[in-house]
């Protein structure tokens, strides 16, 4: 009898964690899309994981997964095409 109670309690906790993680993921994705649409300079989500260089954590190069990945990077973060062009123009060219 006691083992059935522990089994039901464990399943209930696992189910509650599953639901709360789904809700948290949905809230995070809504927050991310709202922030990207308000900024206007970014090209959607997908920033983050950089090429790991062999070992360690995975992730694609520049983290631009499926649709709407970042196309321009300024100091390691996503930026608009105009910002990338301005940054490139502002960088000092070495004189050889």
From Swiss-Prot:
UniProt induction comment: By the removal of auxins.
Signal sequence bounds: 1-25
Physiological role: May be connected with the initiation of embryogenesis or with the metabolic changes produced by the removal of auxins.
Residue stretches of biased makeup (Gly residues): 43-66
Name recorded for this polypeptide: Glycine-rich protein DC7.1
Family per similarity comment: Belongs to the GRP family.
Keywords in alphabetical order: Repeat, Signal
Segments for region (2 approximate repeats of H-H-G(4,6)-H): 42-67
């Amino acid at each position: 009898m006691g083992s059935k109670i522990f089994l039901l309690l464990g399943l209930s906790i696992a189910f509650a964690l599953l639901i709360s993680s789904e809700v948290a993921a949905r809230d995070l994705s809504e927050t991310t899309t709202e922030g990207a649409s308000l900024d206007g300079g970014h090209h959607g989500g997908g920033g983050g994981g950089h090429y790991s260089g062999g070992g360690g954590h995975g992730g694609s190069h520049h983290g631009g997964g499926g649709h709407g990945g970042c196309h321009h990077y300024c100091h390691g973060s996503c930026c608009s095409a105009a910002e990338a062009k301005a940054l490139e123009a502002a960088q000092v060219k070495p004189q050889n």
